[in-house]
A protein has these predicted regions:
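Long, low-complexity intrinsically disordered regions
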Residues: 1-291, 300-328, 332-354, 359-434
Length: 434
């Protein structure tokens, strides 16, 4: 079949979902380290966010693709593997990335002085103290900021940025500059444990010099593969690249054959298709649409022991790469989404921690969730159905109810409690009781 220059919005959605690994059944067995490795490699990064009203974001993104898995296995893979394959870096924001990406992101460490001046000013304000922190780590090995004395020699809490101690601000700045790297997370607050970068990142990667343009092209290759299809602004946003710079290098990727210019129904901006994306999407098309066929017997299982046939469905973290660019998901899915954590309660439209629900190839609903660990239940504070999903209201409700049960079991909660708020609450509650 010859390449097409005009794509429907449905085609674009399928391509995007396939690129994100959301077009296929979850493993029937419990996901393992190899599955987690493939997810991170496919996405290029996992954004770290420890808002724990439900589960930290870096754990939920694999869950959306793999179903229930042992969260400790992700920590082991990232921080405690015999040969380090992944590390934390400022990629999009603080992220888990394949360690091989270090040379591509290295040039950006010098730019952090401008982006995060509130932190790096501590290195200029306390140069001798900053040197002493590095020397302390050199002598004692990997440390948490809480194990370091403050500037005045005390171990008390002195006010820094966001109320952090000055020691933590200095360690954060050293991390942003690439002078220290994260070896582990520890304690109830998941504190970073940092060592000298030269003892964490392999020498071959540290010594590899990548010119800025080559690094940007490398990051854009990762972004375009992870998106499958998109605009320059979509691709630039993936690793927080400058749009003007990205524009030039996207043109070079088109010339090199990595991307192809296409037109997408309803898009005003020029769209670009990754060279491998259309074929990958075609292989998952019947699964996305929920049609029967050779893949129709596939099932998705969670730790609850319940399995359900296709169509595919998944709750998505607010920090999932599929939805973190709000303009992109509005264009792709006609889904108006904003995370309202920082919005005063009285002004929130949907809720505090609202997750989009993917059903087949559309974002069909949204739910405000809270893991109530004291009560042992997953609370659905509010639930809303998207207008386009009304004809499939019952099907969406049953798929979402099953996904909520799977998530609750994965989080070690005994059940799901569905609140009355929202236009989908009654239907969802009935489906959960079936």
């Amino acid at each position: 079949m010859p390449p097409r220059d005009d794509l429907s919005l449905t085609d674009a959605r399928r391509i995007a979902l396939a690129a994100q690994g959301l077009d296929r059944p979850r493993p029937r067995r419990r996901a393992n380290a190899d599955d987690l490795r493939r997810v991170i490699d496919r996405l290029g990064l996992l954004q770290i966010d420890y808002v724990n009203v439900l589960v930290p974001a870096q754990y939920q993104v694999p869950f959306s693709r793999l179903g229930a898995y042992d969260r400790a296995s992700l920590d082991t893979l990232v921080y405690r593997a015999p040969e380090r394959e992944f590390t934390e870096m400022w990629a999009r924001e603080a992220s888990i990335v394949p360690i091989a990406h270090w040379p591509l992101l290295r040039y950006r460490m010098d730019q952090q002085d401008r982006r995060y001046r509130a932190f790096t000013q501590f290195l200029d304000k306390y140069p001798d103290y900053s040197k002493s922190v590095l020397e302390e780590i050199r002598k004692r090995g990997a440390l948490a900021a809480s194990e370091l004395p403050e500037v005045d020699g005390s171990r008390g809490r002195s006010k820094g940025f966001w109320g952090w101690s000055q020691a933590r601000c200095v360690v954060e700045a050293l991390f942003m500059r690439g002078q220290v790297s994260v070896t582990d997370r520890r304690g109830s607050n998941n504190a970073r444990i940092c060592d000298l970068t030269e003892r964490v990142i392999p020498r071959a990667l540290l010594e590899r010099t990548v010119e800025r343009g080559e690094a940007i092209r490398g990051l854009l290759r990762l972004a375009t593969r992870a998106h499958g299809i998109g605009t320059v602004s979509d691709f630039a946003d993936y690793f927080r690249l400058r749009i003007r710079e990205a524009q030039r290098h996207v043109a070079e990727l088109v010339e090199a054959g990595d991307l192809r210019e296409v037109r997408v129904e309803g898009w005003r901006e020029q769209a670009y298709l990754h060279k491998d994306a259309e074929a990958a999407a075609a292989s998952g098309r019947s699964r996305l649409s929920g049609s029967s066929g050779s893949s129709g017997t596939s099932e998705r299982s969670g730790s609850s022991g319940r399995s359900r046939p296709e169509p595919l469905a998944a709750l998505l973290s607010p920090f999932d790469p599929l939805v973190w660019n709000r303009a992109r998901i509005a264009r792709l899915f006609d889904f108006d989404y904003v995370l309202e954590i920082w919005v005063p309660a009285a002004k929130r439209r949907w809720g505090y921690y609202v997750l989009p629900f993917l059903f087949e190839e559309r974002l069909a609903a949204r739910v405000d969730l809270k893991a109530d660990r004291d009560a042992g239940v997953l609370r659905v504070i509010s639930s809303y159905l998207e207008p386009h999903a009304q004809p499939k209201r019952d099907a969406v409700a049953h798929a979402l109810a099953a996904e909520l049960q799977t998530m609750a079991a994965w989080l070690g909660l005994s059940g799901v409690q569905i609140g009355r708020r929202g236009d989908f609450a009654r239907t969802l509650g009935a489906a959960a009781r079936d």
